């Protein structure tokens, strides 16, 4: 066991439905109590994950508890989980310093000045999509835009869930198409296709859902047309204070790492804040600390989810899903449905679309070649399906970041998901695409 951290763990058995019990317990515990209380914010997700993690550690009596704990800890500390946590930490610090310098209020004023009130939700969706398309990460985009969306909703008297939902949806749409996103890289590499080709195939599926999403967000139910924003004035100070956001978009086009972008944003917020006399260096440090601490719940959930996934994989749960999927495939159409089912279920259990694509990708390539499915189509199905699933689970990174940054208005995961139109429309578009595909 001393060398556990230095090698990749293989499942102790080929496949086992029993390994999925902890996740089933999580679903029953979290959804069950939430439905009983009719309040999804009453049951902390951390408690649900602790409960299911305890069950995961109890399973497999053939191994000692110490070994299972080490395996669980190894999953908590995996590279992708730690990178995600670093993004959470930097996002918290960036948001806190941006709020302190007045960048959020300035961005709200600019948005109110240029976007009519009845189109504000659609406008946020488009802005979020463009930033995510440039930066290549939905998480980084959500971290930057959600504070603006919340403040904007409060100033316009709108339901914050509308704007936060539009932000998350737009970020996922942009991430799904971006040439530099992790999901694009993972799906194209596993299928050995060009990124541009995958994007073209993605557009065939998600263009109509995205347009429908924008049009639906223009409906009166999502707006407050009685508010007049024509008198909102802005000055040069407002543009200077939003420079970190603008540079985030510009640097994103240069394929710069999102963590580096957030770090640069924190530094710029600090320099601008001190320059405008909003705070001194010590207050800036304090704001950074407060921002990182505000993400603590999100960090805990991410690490517990990583540990739980490691136990499910080690006990043969992922192998079980893969093998059962392969047995249901008999022709080309079945193959496409199978690819979507495979990556979707794995995403459901891992809460990480990149990990789901990397896990399902090699199997998807093998069965796609067997049934003559275009690898560009397979890459697109992997990417789009994982985006759909990631947007409808309350414990995905995108929703967790959004709820953390919208804590001031007490938004639960499900209040955001109910207003998150894009993933649902994408799922519908994906289903239509699968049904209409040639056999």
Report residues per predicted region.
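Core transmembrane alpha-helical segments of multi-pass membrane transporters/permeases
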Residues: 46, 50, 58, 69-102, ...
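Hydrophobic alpha-helical transmembrane segments of multi-pass integral membrane proteins
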Residues: 85-94, 116-148, 326-366, 371, ...
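Hydrophobic mid-bilayer segments of alpha-helices in multi-pass membrane transport proteins
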Residues: 17-29, 40-61, 84-90, 122, ...
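Re-entrant/interfacial helical elements at transmembrane boundaries that shape
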Residues: 140-152, 168, 179-193, 321, ...
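Juxtamembrane and boundary regions of transmembrane helices in multi-pass small-molecule transporters
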Residues: 2-3, 169-172, 176-234, 392, ...
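Alpha-helical transmembrane segments of multi-pass membrane proteins
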Residues: 87, 118-131, 157-174, 334-347, ...
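Membrane-interfacial loop-to-helix junctions in multi-pass transporters
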Residues: 78-84, 109-127, 153-163, 235-243, ...
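Juxtamembrane helix-boundary/capping and inter-helix hinge elements in multi-pass membrane proteins
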Residues: 62-64, 77-81, 157-161, 186-199, ...
